[in-house]
Amino acid sequence: MNIAKFCIRHKVTTLLAVIMIAVFGVVYTTQLQMALLPNIEYPAAYVYCYYNGAGPEDIEQLVTRPLESAIMSVPGVDSVTSSSADSISTIQIMYVENTDVDIAATKLREKFDALSLPDGCGSPVILNINVSEMMPSAIVGLLGDDLAALQQQAENVVAPALERIDGVASVSVSGGVERQITVTLDAQRAAGYGLSTSYITQILQAENLLYPAGEVYNGSQKLSVTTDAQLSTVDEVANINIPLQTGGTVRLGEVADVAFETSDRDAIAAMDGTPGIILQVSKRSGANEVKTAEAVVAAMEELAAKDGSIHYAIPYVASEYINVAVDAALEGIILGVVLAALVVWLFLRRGGATMTIAVSMPVCILAVFVLMYVCDLTLNMMSLGGIAMGVGMIVDNSIIVLENIYRWASEGHDRMTSCVEGTKEVTLSLTASTLTTVAVFLPLGLTGGIAGQIFKDFCLTIAFLILGSLAVAVTLVPLLCYFLLDESKVHLDALQRAQKGGRRAQKLMDWYVKKLDYYVHHLKRGVLVSVALVAVFLAACLNTKMVLLPEMDEGMVTVTVSMPIGSKVEQAAAMAERVAAIAEETIPELASYYYTADSGQSASLVLNLTDKGERDRSATDIANALRDATYDVAGCEITCSAYDMGAMMGGSGVSVNITGEDYTTLKMIADDLTAQIAAIPGAVDVSSTVAEQVPQVKVTADRQACSQYGLTAYSVAAAVRSGLTGTTATTVTIDNKEVDVVVRGDGRAEESLDALRSMAISTPTGGSVPLGSIADVSVVMSPQTITRYNQSRQVTISGDAADGDTSAMAKSIRAILAGYTLPGGYTAELAGGYTEMMENFSDLGLALIVSVGLVYFVLASQFESFVMPVIIMMILPIAFAGALFALPLTGKDLSMISLVSLIMLAGTVVNASIVLVDYIKQRRDRGETREEAILHACPLRIRPVLMTTLTTILALVPTALGMTGKMNEMMSDMGTTMIAGMLVSTVITLLFTPVYYCVIDDLTHHRERRKAQKPAAAQSKP
């Protein structure tokens, strides 16, 4: 049964169904979760393991190598990159595609539990990467001068309150100081009693316990027995009696200074110059980021109102960014709807027609919100971007049906006939064009890597829109036309006036018919002109630079301050403060800043800029200016860059990985290549992971000498570590808070090498021996950081391009590597964000090829012809070339977004060709010649073609102009290329699709004639 006829005859049912969809759409829109980005799970994880006091080589040997061996035995691991530095091993794991990272993490924990890591080494921490959750939901700064009090306030009051919020996964605290009980051993007194730090540590552990002893009966009642010997005050610790090897005891306070004090600072934080503590609030997976962030703000306001001592600031809250982005995207969608409806009114000059379109578009969008809720999608930049990009497309089907209904009515048919037959006549071409458009999104949504995850929501929403538009066009539009169509006013003269639109429109139509007639009768010239256009367009964009994602001005500049080895955390913080002062002097757009110095070797500074509309410079320009302003700052290495989501989605810049075993050789190669890469014009922030080797003290135990005193290499190493670094012996509870008890030497051994050699090492017999008598204490050169790749040592050179053109920079680096002779056993290859970009480009290129193939398949199935799809798709090369031509004209780069827009064009620009070719075929079936059919069909179809093109283009204008959100640069590139491709393809379709039709028609007839001539020639032979 005809769908349009069914809907008109069942008006009430149809309208109630539409109303129900609209109501559900409104309800579900308010229940959809909002996020900045889709859930992007990178197939990677990080492993961190701390071993305080160990140097890079010790970390590599004792921690990194065992962890690497365990990791490589886990199924699904593709590559392992590790970094061994002072006190920490950092390992990046890359999994093969489609690996379940949660299951892999469980297997990693099982492997790690079976390892025997050194005493004092922390447990490995596994962190899976989720790009959408890498940024915290909120950053809270507690301000004040008493850092110990702030630390207690943060840990006892603020952090617990924030962790109780529904949706909060964790709250990390940095920048404060911890209180601890420090037992500082007097070396001379301890040696006199034959005491060592390790022995005192054992006694403290034995004296501080809560031990279950069993059960006893009190009559018929069974009671549990617990031995309680817990320490709870500093005096109790100081008064512990230490048994001596020679008999008797000595009070701990007599051989050591026992004090309740703050620990050494391992992190410093400040906001706008005011010292404080930084709390990073992370949401749990699946939680509503906006509600979570807003709840954090509300909780802080409530805490401050209850406790006047809480002074805080919130430099970052995700809800502000997301709300602004979502609101702007929705405004862009509404504006697109209005502009599309305006086009309909300008062409048809009918209030009923305009109202039909104005009603059908919101119904489609509300239906999409229902499907988004069902499919558990979020309102994010990509899903809203899909709606914004599809607003113009959803009206295309309705316009074609509407225009055809009006044409039937203008020919004198009644309302029922006009609505039913007018819809039926174009249903085939509508279905074909809709399926081709949807088909292109299938391979895009199934693309692997980051590209597939980024565009999954985008593809689903736009596919929902387009399929919904087809349903609305063949059901709701004919029904609304049946209600709103006024037969008395829709007569031929009125329609002709609307169609001609005055003298200027008639002149344009006459010009079009004249050109069309010319090219139809001069096919070779038409083909040559179209080929020349493709060549010109492609030649103009040959020098377009390539980037992974368009630069997104998010209003933040990040600065990394790298300090020399051995620097204290206070020095790193002071340098960060100095850079912040320079920023305050040179950047008028600076709104606020905060920094954290988490180790003595680096500090991270974040500059928050004023809103984009309030400044003339981009975040990248400001970062470049700050880089120049800090160029002369001595004593550290400063890296400045605009905060870029693209870097989080795959890195940025270009890297060179050099692999080999000998560190000295690696350093030599890296130094040579770093100098050459830094000399590339436009190269900035060029550095390598190799650094100057620094002196390190190495203690090598003499096993024979140790055995004479009853010592082992391990007991000597433990004694040296305890004397220099200190050992956490136990924990005590003071004021309901666990406090570490740290045993350490008095610091004399740290003063010089001779003092270290003189350190007294206690023996099992109660005596002591100088360290220098049982071990060799010498100075050796050691690297600051040791990097490994797949269990081989590696050095990485990284850099970026000042203008972002990493493709040109990579080309220059390739030339350098090609001319560089490497020693045997060493390799150097490109890596970094550039290789990630090329992999994603390759995936999208394959998706484009598959999309074109699917378009052909759909068209061939729809028209039951192998030839007609070729005619229709001849427009694609010119559309692609025209879209790329727009990039250099508008100052944009070739990015992953640009390639996605080409894939979209593959399914959209053919729609006009489908309408033309289908109608030409219909007229030829009615008996017209080829030329007559073309010259009659094309002018009649020019209005729906122009209407659909203009509605799509105007609906994309807000996106192209950057009116769809705070990070509008991403969708702006897509809007620009789509508009350019649509403009070029429409003009070419109207002029040259008939040419291609004639050429292929001639070739088909020529082949048929040759086939017919062969049997005739065979029969004529004697």
Where are these regions (language model features)?
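Extracytoplasmic/periplasmic membrane-proximal domains and adjacent transmembrane bundles
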Residues: 6, 37, 45-48, 90, ...
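Transmembrane helices with small-residue packing motifs
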Residues: 12, 19-55, 113-120, 165, ...
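Flexible hinge/switch segments at interdomain interfaces of large molecular machines
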Residues: 34-45, 81-87, 121-144, 172-178, ...
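Transmembrane alpha-helices and their membrane-interface boundaries in multi-pass membrane transporters
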Residues: 391-405, 426-446, 453-498, 605, ...
